[in-house]
A protein has these predicted regions:
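"A position-specific structural signal for the A-helix of alpha-solenoid helical repeats
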Residues: 17, 51, 58, 65, ...
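Helix-turn-helix repeat elements of alpha-solenoid scaffolds
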Residues: 24-40, 66-83, 111-127, 154-162, ...
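Alpha-solenoid helical repeat scaffolds
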Residues: 39-42, 77, 84, 120, ...
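Flexible helix-coil transition and linker loops at the boundaries of alpha-helical arrays
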Residues: 41-48, 82-93, 125-139, 178, ...
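Residue-level recognition of tetratricopeptide repeat
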Residues: 52, 86, 95, 174-175, ...
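TPR alpha-solenoid repeat register
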Residues: 55, 98, 132, 178, ...
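Residue-level signature for tetratricopeptide repeat
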Residues: 62, 105, 149-151, 185, ...
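Short coil/turn linking the two alpha-helices of tandem helical-hairpin repeats
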Residues: 87-88, 110, 152-155, 183, ...
Length: 494
């Protein structure tokens, strides 16, 4: 490539970086599960849902990330066609993101003239809409599409998605598309431990009600609202909403899935499985549906385990147990088949079923693979360390490995249920050890760590000093003791 063409390319890249489209938003190859997203987007396109153009646009981006540029162009042509049909008068406003994506794909293909032609189109569209950048306009349609794209990508983008919908609603306050987006972002954030939204976990209710005021046919809003009302013990209205949603949208997978969750939480497992299998018939690769079915069968399996007859191979209860084990393993296995980096809970549930069936080596393989994964969220790593630690403690009888894993779990200070379980397991293990041998340096060190976490510095110092009596060259204890003494002295000097 000569200097001149390189300069043209670089200048073009500077313009492309100013665009508002999938290529300039946060989610990139490293932060999204591409295989899983491709399946979800394909399902959405195949179902021919209301906002199919949105899925085509995001599919173009995912295809481009994988170097499938010709497929990406086809996705964008499909998106453009749908937008022209659905938004005749508002097509130009709706096309800003699609044209931005076109420009980026042509750039990656080395087709710089074509890329520039889309920048020219964007300049003509955006000029009357904004006094800002030449090639984009921060209008509700752009904020809204960005919000939905972020929501589809990963939990780490939910806060930003909510902010995008907020911006869209500032100019277009009665748009159900953006209110639904805002409600969905809130709804998801309310389910995540430690988020400010979790502390005020009914905010989404008002926004979902607003969606239904403006669009009484929005069945997904109905089932989402029903789940929030169920959480708040408003069972009668919740039940009516679910039935209404199923009448209006008897074949929409997202509606069926959320309705199934409602019935599962009401202990109506068979009804939940029936709805989930119906949804699976329409979207056979949907990993979330497989996970939900696995959870329903798991509830049934745990009930069967309570019956002593289930351990007698001659008894029908035993046969039922084996059938349920197969169902659980099949569906949990399908749930993480294409998304090993994101379907962590499904893999942990699969390992749990293996352990209950005496398949310890198979469970061990699952834990080993999980411990090797990279780029996992801290919350998911914490779950892995807890479950792998329990496996090491109870099945492998390896105290040192178990303690190491529980300690890793404590380093993620989120005060979650999983964090508390790591703490409790360490405390229980240390107490048990010290009852047998009061000179056990490892157990004394663990007690020191737990007191340090609790903020009881004098007790922590006492335990670390005692641990060092029996393991005088332990660098971990020496370092902790040094840090504690300094902190203790500073506090008392004040």
């Amino acid at each position: 490539m000569n200097t001149m063409s390189k300069t043209v390319r670089e200048l073009l890249k500077e313009k492309l970086d100013q665009l508002q489209c999938h290529f300039t938003w946060g989610p990139q190859k490293e932060t999204i599960d591409l295989d899983d997203m491709m399946y979800r987007l394909q399902d959405s396109i195949d179902l021919n849902l209301k906002y199919k153009a949105r899925s085509c646009n995001q599919f173009a981006f995912v295809n481009s990330l994988q170097g499938n540029y010709e497929e990406a162009i086809q996705n964008l042509k499909e998106a453009e066609k749908i937008l022209r049909e659905n938004y005749k008068d508002a097509f130009e406003r709706r096309s800003i993101i699609t044209y931005g994506n076109y420009a980026w794909v042509h750039y990656h293909m080395g087709q710089l003239t074509e890329a520039q032609s889309y920048l020219d189109k964007l300049e003509m569209i955006c000029k009357p809409l904004t006094d800002g950048p030449r090639y984009t306009a921060m209008i509700p349609e752009v904020y809204g599409e960005k919000g939905w794209s972020l929501l589809r990508s990963a939990a780490q983008y939910y806060e930003e998605a909510m902010e995008c919908f907020e911006k869209a609603l500032e100019e277009d306050p009665n748009n159900t598309e953006w209110i639904m987006g805002f409600a969905t972002a809130l709804y998801r954030l309310e389910a995540i431990p430690g988020t400010p939204e979790k502390c005020k976990s009914s905010q989404s209710v008002n926004h979902l009600r607003r969606v239904l005021e403006l669009d009484p046919e929005e069945s997904l809003a109905m089932v989402m609202l029903a789940l929030k009302l169920q959480e708040n013990k408003q069972k009668k209205e919740a039940n009516e909403l679910v039935q209404q949603a199923l009448q209006k949208s008897p074949d929409v997978p997202k509606v069926l899935r959320n309705a199934a969750k409602f019935y599962r939480l009401e202990q109506a497992g068979e009804k939940a499985i029936e709805l989930l299998k119906k949804a699976l018939g329409r979207t056979p690769h949907n990993s979330v549906l497989h996970d939900q079915i696995g959870m329903c069968y798991r509830v049934q399996l745990l009930e069967v385990f309570k019956n002593p007859l289930s351990s007698d191979p001659q008894n029908p209860e035993f046969q039922q147990k084996m059938v349920l084990i197969d169902h659980c393993k099949h569906h949990f296995g399908k749930a993480f088949e294409h998304r090993p980096r994101t379907a962590i809970k499904s893999q942990l549930d699969y390992a749990d079923i293996c352990l209950r069936n005496g398949e310890n080596s198979k469970a061990g393989e699952v834990y080993s693979k999980l411990l090797e994964l990279e780029g996992i969220s801290p919350e998911n790593m914490q779950r892995i360390w807890l479950q792998a630690g329990l496996f090491q403690l109870h099945k492998r009888k390896s105290d040192s490995n178990a303690v190491q894993l529980f300690q890793k779990g404590l380093k993620i200070e989120n005060n979650s249920k999983v964090w508390k379980m790591c703490y409790e397991n360490l405390d229980k293990w240390a107490e048990k050890k010290l009852c047998r041998d009061s000179h056990d340096s490892k157990a004394l060190g663990v007690k020191g760590l737990l007191h340090q976490i609790d903020g009881d510095k004098s007790k922590a110092i006492e335990y670390f000093e005692e641990a060092l009596e029996f393991d005088p060259s332990n660098e971990e204890y020496l370092s902790a003791l040094c840090e504690l003494r300094l902190s203790f002295e500073e506090h008392h000097d004040l």
